[in-house]
């Protein structure tokens, strides 16, 4: 990318983002490669199945200072309320572990937010300014 486009190559100007599994991968990249990425957009990550591994991984990482993560999920991603509660617990547990490592975590629970591109698109006005804060 840097060879073909005008870019700012510094960590401060290098971000990653994704939704669903892409959100999970962006979350991982944000702490495992914090020497490259300064900010991550993590939208509707499905972390329930891998939460213990993620928490263990975070605890063993040396995360760069000035790392920030926008972490969001919707209240209506599934039709089951208990899954929303589990997702909230998982996201806040991961966010708290990152905060303990010095990461700035910005949470955003989307009322009636579903697990779909149509709803994620509506978040652009919220998470894009986060990148330039």
Regions found by a protein language model. Name each.
Residues 1-133:
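Non-catalytic cap/lid and distal C-terminal segments of serine-dependent acyl enzymes
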């Amino acid at each position: 990318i840097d060879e073909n486009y005008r870019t700012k190559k510094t960590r401060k100007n290098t971000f990653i983002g994704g939704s669903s599994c892409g959100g999970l991968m962006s979350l991982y990249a944000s702490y495992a490669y914090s020497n490259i990425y300064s900010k991550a957009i993590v939208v509707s990550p499905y972390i329930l199945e891998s939460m213990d591994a993620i928490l263990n991984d975070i605890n063993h990482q040396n995360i760069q200072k000035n790392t920030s993560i926008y972490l969001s999920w919707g209240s209506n991603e599934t039709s089951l309320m208990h899954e929303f509660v589990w997702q909230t617990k998982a996201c806040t547990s991961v966010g708290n572990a990152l905060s303990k490592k010095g990461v700035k975590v910005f949470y955003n629970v989307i009322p009636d937010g579903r697990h779909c591109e149509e709803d994620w698109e509506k978040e652009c006005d919220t998470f894009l300014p986060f990148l330039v804060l």
